[in-house]
Amino acid sequence: MSMSGSKKDVESEKQKALDAAISQIERAFGRGAIMKLKQHPAEKMDSVSTGSIALDAALGIGGLPKGRIVEIFGPESSGKTTLALHVIAEAQKQGGNCAFIDAEHALDTVYARKLGVNVGDLIVSQPDTGEQALHIVEYLVCSGAIDVIVVDSVAALTPRAEIEGDMGDQHMGLQARLLSHALRKLTSVVSKANCILVFINQIRIKIGVIYGNPEVTTGGSALKFYTSIRLDIRKVSAIKDKDNVIGNQTRVKVVKNKVAPPFKQAEFDIVYNEGISKLGEIVDMGVKFGFVEKSGAHYSYGAVKLGQGRENAKGYLKSNPDIANELEQKIRACLAESMHSSDLFAVDERTDVLEEEVF
């Protein structure tokens, strides 16, 4: 027998053995428990916009991926909850159901409404313990009817033993174990339900760190591993109208991304009582892509003079929504073409990524 014939016989036997194993698995666990990917070709991943054009582009797929776990972390008053509420507003615009697990008991419904959230349809829970919060999340995800769930925040998911104990008692690692156990159960059901689970997290300073970044996030290491997206949001500078501070310029770094190239960043304005300024992004990205010409402090769009100074240009676009919409469509078309470019919104890959602290 030739060598080629012998090799074909071996391959045939291996294929028969594989088919038998697959058949046995399907009998034991049901059809769909195992499959070849060619039977289910890859499709474009569904996403929900973050409310920021630049951040949608930096994420690589046009927003936060459905069926995945996301972490948003940063210092106090950096815009974490604002960004999460914008995600809820965008999901509701698509007809989705959303839930907000308010572990901090600090949700401002008036502010949420100003950001575009339909608070009448928003499902809100203010749990007493971390266990209760995560059980509620599990029930909502398993229902298959929720598109976005926001947990605000990880630091406020206090274990029952800590709440029922005395103020000075030590409870090392309780919260980390609670999250680790919950995430092991939630990961698969979040994927099957095609739901976005967003955890908002705080940062702490690790004592005794001389070299490297002393900042750490709360809740242990499990969340870092189970998330598909991690967003580091920071306040860059204040936005002023004469002497009054009216908002913050904000930078978001995509420090982890399992669905597109990571280490990209986006900058946008968060205006008080308004949220993410889409008009500011249109001006900035219009200049970036060459649609808006900036000559000194003057901005123009073709023959149209937008105004002197960035704030005046934003004011003109606010008064002329047709021009703003036209510019936005052109920008989004350019982003769609270059979304997967390695240089678009790229940052240094050596960016310090926060470690996690076990509480």
UniProtKB/Swiss-Prot annotation:
Compartments, record wording: Cytoplasm
Function comment: Can catalyze the hydrolysis of ATP in the presence of single-stranded DNA, the ATP-dependent uptake of single-stranded DNA by duplex DNA, and the ATP-dependent hybridization of homologous single-stranded DNAs. It interacts with LexA causing its activation and leading to its autocatalytic cleavage.
Lineage: Bacteria, Pseudomonadati, Pseudomonadota, Alphaproteobacteria, Rickettsiales
Family annotation (InterPro entries): AAA+_ATPase (IPR003593), DNA_recomb/repair_RecA (IPR013765), DNA_recomb/repair_RecA_CS (IPR020584), P-loop_NTPase (IPR027417), RecA-like_C (IPR049261), RecA-like_N (IPR049428), RecA_ATP-bd (IPR020588), RecA_C_sf (IPR023400)
GO MF term set: ATP binding; ATP hydrolysis activity; ATP-dependent DNA damage sensor activity; damaged DNA binding; single-stranded DNA binding
Gene Ontology annotations for the cellular component aspect, listed alphabetically: cytosol
Protein name from the UniProt record: Protein RecA
The keyword Nucleotide-binding is annotated on this UniProt entry: yes
Positions bound to ATP: G74, P75, E76, S77, S78, G79, K80, T81
Entries under Pfam families matching the protein: RecA (PF00154), RecA_C (PF21096)
Keywords of this entry: ATP-binding, Cytoplasm, DNA damage, DNA recombination, DNA repair, DNA-binding, Nucleotide-binding, SOS response
Keyword presence, Transport: no
Principal subcellular localization: cytoplasm
Family designation: Belongs to the RecA family.
GO biological process: DNA recombination; DNA repair; SOS response
Listed CDD domains: RecA
